[in-house]
Curated annotation (Swiss-Prot):
Name listed for the protein in its UniProt record: Fimbrial assembly protein, serogroup A1
Alphabetical keyword list: Fimbrium biogenesis
Top-level taxonomic group: Bacteria
Amino acid sequence: MNKQRFLFAAKISGIHFLLSLVVALALAGLIFFVWYPFPYQKIMGSFK
């Protein structure tokens, strides 16, 4: 495998990782802050 192909593959895999992270964080935010907010905020101590 030549260096140019490796750099291209590394760039694409990095982009894929970042997009996957954004999707995962968006879904976690939707689940924990919109759909089921009650027990998690109380457990973390935000309502004192």
